[in-house]
Amino acid sequence: MVKNNKRKRVVIAMSGGVDSSVAAALLKEEGHEVIGISMQVWDYTRFTAEEGEKFDTCCSLDDIHDARRVAEQLEIPFYVVNFEEEFQNLVIDDFVNEYLLGRTPNPCVRCNQWIKFELLLKKARGLGADMIATGHYARTEQDADGRYRLMKGVDPAKDQSYFLFTLTQEQLAMTLFPLGGMTKQEVRALAAGYGLRVAEKGESQEICFVPDNDYVRFIEEERGKQLLSGNIVDRKGKVLGVHDGTYRYTVGQRKGLGIAHPEPLYVLGVDAARKEVTVGPRDALYSDGLIATAINWIAPTPETAIEASCKIRYRHHPIPCRILPLADNRAEVRFTEREKSVTPGQAVVFYDGDTVLGGGWIEHAVNTKTAVSHE
C-alpha cells in the first residue's frame, strides 16, 4: 500500500464514514503521522428531511462530526476546510450546466478531479504532508521505470477506479489508497476491531448535494425553471408529444415520457439547442461505439489504435473495445459488440485487465453509418 516503509506525514480525507475512518486507523497503525481533514462542500440547511428521515449522502455536518470523533478516538489532529465556494463553481455549476446542455454529468468524477486531488492536495502540501490518502477502493503500483499505475480495487463490488481516471502521475505519486486490497466486509470487520464508532454506519448512496435524488428540482432551484420546453419526436422527426424541459431527460429513460404508444419508447437523445427529445424502441439504444473528449491517459499515450476494455458508466461491466486516439485529445472507441445507452456527458474509462489506462468524457455515440472526423 505505502510507497516505501519510511514514516510519512499523511493527510487523510475523512468523510465520517467507515471507509475513510478505517483508512486513517490503518495509516496510524503503520506508524505514519496522520492528519485528518474533512471538507465542507455543501450547505445542508438548504434541505429539510422529514422527521425520522436521514439522507444517504456523505459530507453533511453530521458526517463531519463523526469524522471529528473518530479522529479524537485515533488521537490524530483534525481540521475542517471550507471548499463550498470552489465546490459550487467547479462541481455544482458544471452539473447544472451539463444537464442544461442536454448531457448527463458525473459530479463524483469532477469532485475527485478538482476538489480532492487538486484543492485538498494543495492544502496537504501546505501542512507539509508527504502524501494524501482516501478511502477509495482502488490501488496504485509503481513500475520499474518509476511510472505509476492506477488499478481496480480487489473487491469487484466496491471498485472505485472508474471515478479516478483523471488522476495525473504527479497526483498518483502522492496518493495512498489503504483499502484497495480489501473487501468491504474486511473493512467493516477492521472497524469493529478498532472499536470505531462508525463501524456499522450505512453507506452514502446519492449525490451529496442532491440528497433527495430529485435532479430536476435541484436544477430549477439553482437556475429557476428553464425555458427548454419543446417537442418529443421519433427518429424521423415526427412530433409525438411535448415536454417541460430537456434537462428532465437522459438517454435510456423510459418513465415520464407521457406518450401513449403501442410499444415502449425510450429516450434516444437530447438536443437542448433544438429543445427536442428523441425517442424510439429499445433496440435503437444500441451503438457501435462513441467519441470521447478531454482524454486523460494514465498509461503512456498510445500512438495507434489499441485493444482494451472500457466502462461507459460506473455500474457497467467492462466490455472489449478498440480505442483510436484522435487529434485534440479525443478518441474513437469501437465496441466489439453493440452497447446500450451510450450517454453524452458520462465518463468512459479504459482498462487493460485491472489497470486503468485512462479515460474521457462521452461526446456522442457512434454507429456504423455515423461519419467520424479523424482530423
UniProtKB/Swiss-Prot annotation:
Give the catalytic activity.
Answer: S-sulfanyl-L-cysteinyl-[protein] + uridine(34) in tRNA + AH2 + ATP = 2-thiouridine(34) in tRNA + L-cysteinyl-[protein] + A + AMP + diphosphate + H(+)
In its UniProt entry, what is this protein called? Answer: tRNA-specific 2-thiouridylase MnmA
- Write down the position(s) of the site called Interaction with tRNA: 136, 346
Residues of the active site: 111, 208
Q: What is its EC number?
A: 2.8.1.13
NCBIfam families per UniProt: PRK00143.1, trmU
Q: Provide the binding site for ATP.
A: 13-20, 39, 135
Query: What PANTHER family does the database record attribute to this sequence?
Result: MITOCHONDRIAL TRNA-SPECIFIC 2-THIOURIDYLASE 1, TRNA 5-METHYLAMINOMETHYL-2-THIOURIDYLATE -METHYLTRANSFERASE
A Pfam family annotated for this UniProt entry: tRNA_Me_trans_M
A GO biological process of this protein is: tRNA wobble position uridine thiolation
The role this protein plays is:
Catalyzes the 2-thiolation of uridine at the wobble position (U34) of tRNA, leading to the formation of s(2)U34.
Where it sits in the cell: the answer is: Cytoplasm
**Which GO cellular component terms, listed alphabetically, does the Swiss-Prot or TrEMBL entry include?**
cytoplasm
Main location group: cytoplasm
Give the family, as the similarity comment puts it.
Belongs to the MnmA/TRMU family.
List, alphabetically, the InterPro entries matched. MnmA-like, MnmA-like_C, MnmA-like_central, MnmA-like_central_sf, Rossmann-like_a/b/a_fold
Q: Where is this region: Interaction with tRNA?
A: 158-160, 313-314
Disulfide bond positions: 111-208
Q: Which GO terms describe its molecular function?
A: ATP binding; tRNA binding; tRNA-uridine 2-sulfurtransferase activity
The UniProt keywords, alphabetically, are: ATP-binding, Cytoplasm, Disulfide bond, Nucleotide-binding, RNA-binding, Transferase, tRNA processing, tRNA-binding
Specify the species.
Geotalea uraniireducens (strain Rf4)
